[in-house]
Swiss-Prot record:
It is found in: Cytoplasm. It comes from Histophilus somni (strain 129Pt) (Haemophilus somnus). This is Alanine--tRNA ligase. The lineage of its organism: Bacteria, Pseudomonadati, Pseudomonadota, Gammaproteobacteria, Pasteurellales. Consists of three domains; the N-terminal catalytic domain, the editing domain and the C-terminal C-Ala domain. The editing domain removes incorrectly charged amino acids, while the C-Ala domain, along with tRNA(Ala), serves as a bridge to cooperatively bring together the editing and aminoacylation centers thus stimulating deacylation of misacylated tRNAs. Its EC number is 6.1.1.7. The keyword Nucleotidyltransferase does not apply. InterPro entries: aa-tRNA-synth_II/BPL/LPL, Ala-tRNA-lgiase_IIc, Ala-tRNA-ligase_IIc_anticod-bd, Ala-tRNA-synth_IIc_core, Ala-tRNA-synth_IIc_N, Ala-tRNA_ligase, Ala_tRNA_ligase_euk/bac, DHHA1_dom. One of its GO terms (cellular component) is cytosol. Catalyzes the attachment of alanine to tRNA(Ala) in a two-step reaction: alanine is first activated by ATP to form Ala-AMP and then transferred to the acceptor end of tRNA(Ala). Also edits incorrectly charged Ser-tRNA(Ala) and Gly-tRNA(Ala) via its editing domain. GO terms for biological process: alanyl-tRNA aminoacylation; negative regulation of DNA-templated transcription. PANTHER family: ALANINE--TRNA LIGASE, CYTOPLASMIC, ALANYL-TRNA SYNTHETASE. Its main location: cytoplasm. Belongs to the class-II aminoacyl-tRNA synthetase family.
Length: 874
């Protein structure tokens, strides 16, 4: 019986033997595709190839693609652990044809791999296939070409309420490539409930889809017309976990070898004896998605991809709590995961220390609020009426205790209670927009400039070339000419202009001809062509016209200084902080460089100095900057670093600076590092959980910055009547003096407050043997109020004291209760009751609590409400 790792390798070996290029799994973070939150299918990395926007050196490919479906449109999170086949992370085995073979070979390849004794050897009688109702060609290949009996072939029509809306018709979107598909199902046997595809019992588990083969043969236009594609293609997908369950003779994906080893480890860590417990499944699934997402550069945070990761981690931790985990456990699964994933675990293994560290930190952070949040939820669930938990409680759990809504829903589901999601949404307001930041991943991919042909880039060696205008776009539409004053996008057949990529902004300059000038403000790449964005200053510009394209060399030179310095900075960060540092984003302009990178902890000042010194050391070394073009595998073998969010072809450009830095990069660089002159870090900050940002300047800009800082230093010294060398000592003296004065002032305030307390004690009234003081005090700060409250509690014995004071437009409230009364009068509840009257809220201990408000005009109302409550409850 084959292991999952052996099945994965067999699939790749089979298609390699059929002339397919084995392509590594792409990152779970889609490259340059804003329409996707996570990679969720094998075809994602080939999307531009299918759309005709990219070319590869091969026409046949095969992959074992890592996928995540959690968050966004494809969200399996709530079902994970409760069904046999839902996962947040899975592997999709796929074979692809880019205008090469089509239906006949695709079908025969699939059948051979599944049934041949040399490969998987499945019994033919256990397999059923579906085809699109009108796809007679596929039906004929299955029946006559392969020999599948007619009673094992099922035609599926438009079963989703519209033309071409079918389980057996695939489309990339409302427009674009689409076509019929054929699916292969495995029959688990009569002992499992379920019916054939298309029957009323099709949702059962007897007949399970294992392979989907899509025939991309049409291009759907906006009016619904189907045009035949000139080069039909094939896109297939087979879930590795599903086919492993078939081969290993089990009906649930969670019973295959990978999951059984993970489940056993979870049980060991938590002490759980029942290996069928669904919480074990949840955790075993979630460690896969979490570890691979972190390895691919996602950091837990409160927005976008990072928030989805945080939700998955917290769901796993909550299920660990259910199993009885007393300590951090989740990160301890990483070594087992690496082992069971075999060769597919190499990416996690390379970043194992960082993956484990981030998982541990996230679990520790959530553990601080988990038990208190669960206690609040348990109390709320006891009081639930009509089987619905209020949105207000769900929001409080989210806002105060860090419970994602689906985690709360998970707990409610176990008790057959649903959440008032509309109420939750109302409470979310602005915070909902942040937590749902994934919604920004919704750009229509078809809304791009599509132009036949390519633009040849001459900019590595030239700053000026002669070129022909191949297309013009004005106000989003293709036009034949533009006039002076109009802003447009100009497409050229050749260009020296660098198009924005890899964080480097696009070149500026001008396009000129006799009596014509077009000022280029930016350059962008659209598929295989370069768009020169700007305004026509003089004359007219026509498609087909020959012009001179001239780059602004001063702008480019300043930009190249910053780009080369960014490479040196990246290398220095990895040397000083560790190899876990990975680029998360960058901006390289003519004025500044900005570099965002994974770093779970704050950077110490001495580390920043070391990084800066290291960069300047390699600038002074005046390394030759060498660029080479080579196969991507060779580049990676040499240690070249790839940049986050960039897409690379089979052949790449490598930029090397001495032995210090080597990266894949298509950008413009200096010839020697000495040209950078000077590198100065001007800012370092956190921009998200686990992500830091460094901003720096170079060359003349760095000198200007240092001169400005020197001027500020001298002005500050003059103001403090000191010299620059003694400035720190002078400031320290002033701070010490200010602290001493503040301490003396506070002592005077407390002394005054103690005296005031003695006077106030005389105004206490008695309610059923309890001394009560409810007053507004003037000219008192919060610290003084607390001193008075503590003093009065000591003086009066059994007492409740409530004070209100006004400072400008703000209200401060302090309530104190002697410990003998806290069972029936809680300071936190009473201060909140008062705060509600003045537009505020607060809290604290049962014996001492504070609150603030913004409506001083309602102070008398707050005092009245407090008095009434005390008369009623004492």
């Amino acid at each position: 019986m084959k292991t999952t790792a052996e099945i994965r390798q067999a699939f790749l070996d089979f298609f390699h033997s059929k002339g397919h290029q084995i392509v590594d799994s792409s990152s779970l973070v889609p490259e340059n595709d804003p329409t996707l939150l996570f990679t969720n299918a094998g075809m994602n990395q080939f999307k531009d190839v299918f759309l005709g926007l990219d070319t590869r050196s091969y026409t046949r490919a095969t992959t074992a693609q890592r996928c995540v479906r959690a968050g966004g449109k494809h969200n399996d999170l709530e079902n994970v652990g409760y069904t046999a086949r839902h996962h947040t992370f899975f592997e999709m085995l796929g074979n692809f044809s880019f205008g090469d073979y089509f239906k006949q070979d695709a079908i025969k390849f699939a059948w051979e791999f599944l049934t041949s004794p040399e490969w998987l050897g499945l019994p033919e009688e256990k397999l059923y296939v579906t085809v699109y109702e009108t796809d007679d060609e596929a039906y004929g290949i299955w029946h006559k070409g392969v020999g599948v009996p007619e009673n094992h072939i099922i035609r599926i029509g438009d079963n989703k309420g519209a033309p071409y809306a079918s389980d057996n018709f695939w489309a990339m979107g409302d427009t674009g490539p689409c076509g019929p598909c054929t699916e292969i199902f495995y029959d688990h046997g009569e002992h499992v409930w379920g019916g054939l595809p298309g029957s009323e019992e099709e949702d059962g588990d007897r007949y399970i889809e294992v392979w989907n083969i899509v025939f991309m043969q049409f291009n759907r236009l906006a009016d619904g017309t189907m045009e035949k594609l000139p080069k039909p293609s094939v896109d297939t997908g087979m879930g590795l976990e599903r086919i492993s369950a078939v081969i290993q003779h089990v009906n649930s994906n969670y019973d295959i070898d990978i999951f059984q080893k993970l489940i056993a480890k979870v049980a060991e860590l938590t002490g759980e004896k029942d290996l069928t417990n669904k919480s074990l499944r949840v955790i075993a699934d979630h460690i896969r998605s979490c570890a691979y997402l972190i390895a691919d550069g996602v950091i837990p945070s409160n927005e976008g991809r990072g928030y989805v990761l945080r939700r998955i981690i917290r769901r796993a931790v909550r299920h660990g709590h259910l199993l009885g985990a007393k300590d951090t456990f989740f990160y301890k699964l990483v070594p087992v995961l690496i082992d069971v994933m075999a060769t597919a675990g190499k990416d996690v293994k390379a970043k194992q220390a960082n993956v484990e560290k981030l998982l541990r930190l996230e679990e520790e952070q959530f553990a601080r609020t988990l038990e208190r949040g669960l206690a609040l939820l348990d109390e709320a669930l006891i009081n639930v009426k009509d089987g619905v938990l209020s949105g207000e409680v769900a929001f409080k759990l989210y806002d105060t205790y860090g419970f994602p809504l689906d985690l709360t829903a998970d707990v409610c589901r176990e008790r057959n209670i649903r959440i008032d999601e509309e109420g939750f949404e109302r409470e979310m307001e602005v915070q909902r927009l942040r937590a749902q930041a994934a919604s920004r991943f919704g750009v229509d991919y078809n809304n791009v400039i599509r132009v036949e042909g390519t633009t040849t880039f001459e900019g590595y060696t030239e700053a000026e070339t002669q070129a022909k205008v191949t297309a013009l776009f004005y106000e989003g539409k293709s036009v034949e000419s533009i006039s002076a004053g109009q802003s447009a996008v100009v497409i050229l057949d050749d260009t020296p202009f660098y198009a924005e990529s890899g964080g480097q902004i696009g070149d500026r300059g001008c396009l000129i001809a006799t009596n014509m000038r077009f000022d280029v403000k930016d350059t962008q790449k659209y598929g295989q062509v370069f768009g020169h964005i700007g305004t026509l200053i003089q004359g007219t510009l026509n498609v087909g016209q020959t012009i001179n394209a001239v780059v602004d060399t001063e702008h480019r030179t300043k930009t190249s200084l910053n780009h080369s310095a960014t490479h040196l900075l990246h290398a220095a960060l990895r040397q000083v902080l560790g190899t876990h540092v990975a680029q998360k984003g960058s901006l390289v302009s003519d004025t500044i460089l900005r570099f965002d990178f994974a770093q779970p902890e704050a950077i110490r000042q001495e580390q920043l100095f070391e990084i800066e010194c290291l960069v300047n050391q390699h600038i002074r070394a005046n390394h030759l900057v060498v660029t080479e073009v080579m196969p991507i595998d060779e580049a990676k073998a040499k240690g070249a670093m790839a940049l986050f969010g960039e897409k690379y072809g089979d052949v790449v450009r490598v930029v090397k600076m001495g032995e210090f830095s080597i990266e894949l990069c298509g950008g413009i660089h200096v010839k020697r590092t000495g040209e950078i002159g000077l590198f100065k870090i001007v800012s370092e900050s956190a921009i998200a959980a686990g992500v830091r940002r460094v901003e720096a300047v170079t060359g003349e800009a760095a000198i200007n910055w240092l001169q400005q800082q020197q001027q500020i230093l001298m002005q500050s010294a003059d103001l403090l009547k000191s010299d620059a060398n003694s400035l720190v000592e002078k400031i320290q003296q002033l701070q010490d003096k200010a602290k001493k004065t503040e301490k003396e002032l506070q002592a005077l305030k407390e002394k005054s407050a103690m005296k005031a307390g003695s006077d106030i004690a005389k105004s206490a009234v008695e309610i059923n043997g309890v001394s009560v003081i409810v007053q507004q005090l003037e000219n008192m700060d919060v610290k003084s109020l607390r001193v008075i409250v503590d003093d009065l509690k000591n003086q009066l014995g059994s007492a409740v004291i409530a004070f209100v004071t006004k400072t400008e437009d703000k209200v401060n409230l302090v309530v104190g209760v002697t410990t003998d009364l806290t069972s029936k009068v809680k300071a936190g509840e009473l201060v909140n009751l008062m705060a509600q009257q003045v537009g505020g809220k607060g809290g604290g201990r049962p014996d001492m609590a504070m609150a603030g408000g913004s409506q001083p005009e309602n102070i008398s109302k707050a005092l009245t409400v407090c008095n009434e409550w005390l008369h009623k409850n004492l």
